[in-house]
UniProtKB/Swiss-Prot annotation:
This is Phosphoribosyl-AMP cyclohydrolase. Its main location: cytoplasm. Its cofactor is Mg(2+); Zn(2+). One of its GO terms (biological process) is L-histidine biosynthetic process. It comes from Rhodopseudomonas palustris (strain BisA53). Mg(2+) binds at D91, D93, D95.
Length: 147
């Protein structure tokens, strides 16, 4: 990536400048929030390393870095449910990415749901936290897709 190092840039250059200076964490990752470009709904939160960010910029497809598998992956490479990036943004200090996508097949979550955020935190009768399914319909069977 041809971006300048964030540590060498003045805060004003990072916050107001026009040069891409992503600020990766100690593990070389940056948080990426992915939303549906039409509805604005949050589909998922994932991580990108420098290579994933560059591949996303270059290809127009969403690429991420899997922390659990320690590898780069293109969204949809297993399921076929590719995310086409319509817009990318960085936050004010360039340590988080927001991408607006067209979600192929309608489902972004590996559980088969449209969004990874399919449980709302409520409280039970005693006041203890309770997860309540919302928008939890499965659009595909993960056991059949991820063999």
């Amino acid at each position: 990536m041809s971006a300048s190092s964030p540590s060498s840039a003045a805060p004003d250059d990072v916050e107001e400048g026009l040069v891409l200076r992503p600020k990766f964490d100690a593990n070389g990752l940056i948080t990426c929030v992915t939303t549906d470009a039409t509805s604005g709904d949050v589909l998922m939160v994932a991580f990108m390393n420098a290579e994933a960010l560059q591949k996303t910029i270059d290809s127009g497809d969403a690429w991420y870095f899997s922390r659990s598998r320690a590898k780069l992956w293109r969204k949809g490479e297993s399921s076929g449910l590719v995310q086409k990036v319509l817009e990318m943004r960085l936050d004010c200090d360039q340590d988080a990415v927001w991408i607006k996508v067209e979600q192929g097949g309608g489902a972004a979550c590996h559980t088969g749901r449209r969004s990874c955020f399919y449980r709302r935190i409520d409280r039970d009768d005693t006041g203890a936290p309770l997860l309540t399914p919302v928008d939890a319909e499965r659009l595909f069977d993960p056991a059949k897709v991820y063999r």
